[in-house]
Amino acid sequence: MQRTLSKVILNSGKNNLLKSSNLLNSNLLKATTTNIIGIKTINNNNNVNSIIGFKSLNKRYFTSNTPKVEEEDDEIAPDEAIKAEEKIKETERVIGLSEKLSFQTETQKILHIVAESLYTEKEVFIRELISNASDAIEKVRHTQLTNASMIEDASIPFEIKISTDEDNKTLIIQDSGIGMTKDEMIKNLGKIGYSGSSDFIKKLGENPDKASIIGQFGVGFYSCFMVGHTIKIYTKSATPGSKGYLWESDGTGSYSITEAEGVSRGTKIIIHLKPSSYEYSKKSIVENIIKKYSNFVGFPIALNGTTVNTIKPLWTLNKNAISEEEHKEFYQFLSKSYDTPSYRVHFSTDTPLSIRSIFYIPSQHMEKYGMGKMEPGVSLFSRKVLIQQKANGILPEWMRFVRGVVDSEDIPLNVSREHLQDNGLIQRISSVLVKRILKHLNDEAKSDPEKFNVFMTEFGGFFKEGIITDFKWKDEISKLLRFESSNGSTASKTDAVSLEQYVSRMKPEQKNIYFLSVPNRAVGLSSPYYEPFQLKDIEVIFLYNAVDEFVLTNVGHFGDKKIVSVESKEAEEFLATNQDKKTETLSQDEIDKFLSWVSTVASDKVTQAKSTTRSISSPAIIIDHESANFRRMLKMVEPGKQHETPKQVVEFNMNHPIILKLVQQTESNPTIAKLVIDQVVDNAFVSAGLIEDNREMIPRINQLLDSLLTK
């Protein structure tokens, strides 16, 4: 039952979801008008659409190579827009005879797998090729730093160029990296992986889940055969004196290598696209893919002459070198929102794991507006290359409100970078990150309690979800919970108490942390269950949400203090005693006789009648009953089922004036006595929250009023 309830209570407490719809509409309008300003579309004879004057909120990060246009100038010549695009040309020239070679038998099989079935999204071939290009440039950069004389054409800038051609249906990706010699081309492109292709095939046969083992072999380049019918590669090694070569293949089993002139240092890949993949010759589509997967690659990526990746990867920078404005704009880029984050966590470590991360915690969330459950807000990178957007498992589901980036070189990835091979490692990384975020929030709560209390009013539901669904973190999360208590003077959202604060204010003789579930503060302060604690100045936490009692029940203990409902029998350490006001009116025989009479005449609701000294102002009270919140959750689990209120053990204050007078009426006026005892019992049920519809009391109350007035 508890597991079922856990699924239901996560959606409780959302009665006011739509109260801010006007604000939401306003924000959406603001987002639309702020993000896109001054769009002008120009059509030339070739139906080329150019968007001029795009202004982004992230202007600090975005730059443009487009010539400056005066704001009042509404016209721009189509020819000028075309000239702004710099296309990569195939200017190389082959010399000599081609050498035709065959792929290894195993490599042919693997090539078919890669081209046809490995990747779930074809578009990732661009990510793979950019990642390879970045690696190649990094190699030549490192060599140039350590031994510049070993690098050919050291003055060539480190950059990745991409060119689209819709007329010829081609896509070209060129880098100024380390390049390849002829032997390296045969070694790297003629066979797959250094771990042994036969072993690779063997593992594929043993494991039906190709993605689980294929990451052990380097086959990223071959992803371009998913979209291309012919692949041409011009390459020249960075080693001084190296020759240039052309590698060409249609992926059917063989390839050719030919010496070529006019080849620049690095590698140029020309993909002649299949008809089913012509969309990758369109600039807009390729640009979106670059921004999706490779926005933070460490080297410039120019698409048709314009740099695309102009956003700084803040998680790689020194936290002290980043301004507040940069953080704000980076957060808005990640979250696609326009609020200011409440908190941020910039965390890096090299031991025991390599982690570079930055997290932002928003100031508001959309679930409360009825927008549906949010998706994970953290993206996973490896060396600044996107592995998974909205990554599952990096943070637990209850932390889905967090926005950010995690970059780790320790993550072993499959070749397509779409499945993680080592879930155990991901869990270790997740554990480190969750612990760091919770610690940061706890520190913030202590440094600025008022700000944190406002934050928890907005996001407290997510942390309560975490306690219910993620037992591992319940102790850490419980430190962040905030509740109103009997010590507060008002119902202010900033006048909340943590469990740690509660414990620090406990009486020396107090053993437990006490809570009371009530609809509101006024009901709590007037509750007969609170009365004995009020008399002894014992603080009681008030819970107003149905989920809160379930949350504290799951927490169980805070340190060595048990969390107890004041309505339970365990709360008897602070039972009020009315001995001082006690009058010796009733003998024990009279008490026993009265309790026996109650058990008989009220048997439809009372299983046992007992005497108590727990309450002073109320004639009767129910202890250890099924809570009203629990009953509400049962109804959510089984909405069509009738849940009858079970009989209860009712405890009577035998010194209360009503009870003293009622004892006398049991024999002299049994009709009135029956009406009174039924009302006293029902009042106890109401105080316990066990009666939701009080209308059945009305006829009885009318009878009592009539009897009173006819005397």
UniProtKB/Swiss-Prot annotation:
Molecular function (GO) terms listed? ATP binding; ATP hydrolysis activity; ATP-dependent protein folding chaperone; protein kinase binding; unfolded protein binding
Instruction: Please list the GO biological process terms of this entry.
Output: cell differentiation; positive regulation of gene expression; protein folding; sporulation resulting in formation of a cellular spore
Checking Gene3D superfamilies in the record gives: 3.30.230.80, 3.40.50.11260, Heat shock protein 90, C-terminal domain, Histidine kinase-like ATPase, C-terminal domain
Which effects follow disruption of this gene? Defects in prestarvation response, sporulation and in resistance to heat shock. When overexpressed, induces precocious aggregation, however, development arrests before the tight mound stage.
Q: Where in the cell is it found?
A: Cytoplasm, Cell cortex; Cytoplasm, Cytoskeleton; Mitochondrion; Spore, Perispore
InterPro entries according to UniProt = HATPase_C_sf (IPR036890), HSP90_C (IPR037196), Hsp90_fam (IPR001404), Hsp90_N (IPR020575), Ribosomal_Su5_D2-typ_SF (IPR020568)
Please list which residues make up the signal peptide. Answer: none
**Residues the record lists as binding ATP:** 132, 175, 188, 221, 417
Keywords in alphabetical order, please. Answer: ATP-binding, Chaperone, Cytoplasm, Cytoskeleton, Mitochondrion, Nucleotide-binding, Nucleus, Stress response, Transit peptide
- The ranges of region (Dimerization) come to 303-711
Q: What Gene Ontology terms describe where this protein resides (cellular component)?
A: cell cortex; cytoskeleton; mitochondrial inner membrane; nucleolus; spore wall
Q: Which family does it belong to?
A: Belongs to the heat shock protein 90 family.
Q: What does this protein do?
A: Chaperone that expresses an ATPase activity.
Q: What is this protein called?
A: TNF receptor-associated protein 1 homolog, mitochondrial
Q: State the organism of origin.
A: Dictyostelium discoideum
